[in-house]
Amino acid sequence: MSDIDQWIETLKNGENLKETDVKILCNKAKDILNNEDNVIRVEAPVTICGDIHGQFQDLMELFKVGGDVPETNYLFLGDFVDRGYNSVETFLLLLALKVRYPDQITLIRGNHESRQITQVYGFYDECLRKYSTLNVWKYCTEVFDYLALAAVVNDSIFCVHGGLSPYIKTIDEIRIINRKQEVPHEGVMCDLMWSDPDEIEGWSQSARGAGFVFGADVVKEFNRRNGISLICRAHQLAMEGFKLMFDNSLVTVWSAPNYCYRCGNVASILELDENLKKYYKLFEAAPTDRASNSKKTIADYFL
């Protein structure tokens, strides 16, 4: 068995990798991600997943429902870490799968794939607690800077973590951003990870303090200009697992069931067949006896 296959087995068992192995894995992942464009072209069939937020046992449930890699092609829309108790295992398993099956799993960046955010919402503290050093946090946050910003499925479905930006009109404009940096506090890269749709006209400031709120008219024009039939994003809790808006021109997919171990929501994944027919698969949280019961404080902010 190769090192990478051994690491996948170790992580699936909920065990931590050695720090030296984490460094090797992260370097391998950076080499692969470095060769990917800002906007990745993905071919259907593919299964799209929203926020995971360190809920490792629920990620295992997701794979039970959706199938294992590489039998199923996956596109994850970011926010792999923070809030949940097992961000380390969650992120490293997804990275290991990416290294082992680079064409079967696509990872794009969420607003929590950020040095600043992870220092507040759990990942930083978890790394320190599990490894008694910040090296693993540093290795992982370096990988964050290499993650793509968006994906397009079959030239028809635009996938992003958060939403749109008033500073761009075309997907091609995303392709020229310098993405290899910490998530900025403003600008296009920030907006892609922080913005939200709402029942408004045009654009509005966001209560999140980053990104914007945008309405149906903005989505209609963006989709028309770019030849897109659907915007698929994550970033907001959907109690029923997914939420369609604006005459089905935008969908929020949420893949962390019983978010923060207390919200009581179901989760979903969106399966697209080769003809882009959509199947929303719902799933609930893993049995509580299998989830980590480690007590820790999770900052109370629901983004």
Swiss-Prot record:
Mn(2+) 1 binds at residues 51, 53, 79. The active site is at 112 (proton donor). It comes from the Eukaryota. The keyword Manganese applies. Binds 2 manganese ions per subunit. One of its GO terms (biological process) is double-strand break repair via homologous recombination. Disulfide bonds: none annotated. Mn(2+) 2 binds at residues 79, 111, 161, 235. It is an enzyme of class 3 (hydrolase). Coiled coil: none annotated. Its EC number is 3.1.3.16. Keywords: Hydrolase, Manganese, Metal-binding, Protein phosphatase. It catalyses: O-phospho-L-seryl-[protein] + H2O = L-seryl-[protein] + phosphate; O-phospho-L-threonyl-[protein] + H2O = L-threonyl-[protein] + phosphate. Belongs to the PPP phosphatase family. PP-4 (PP-X) subfamily. This is Serine/threonine-protein phosphatase PP-X homolog 2.
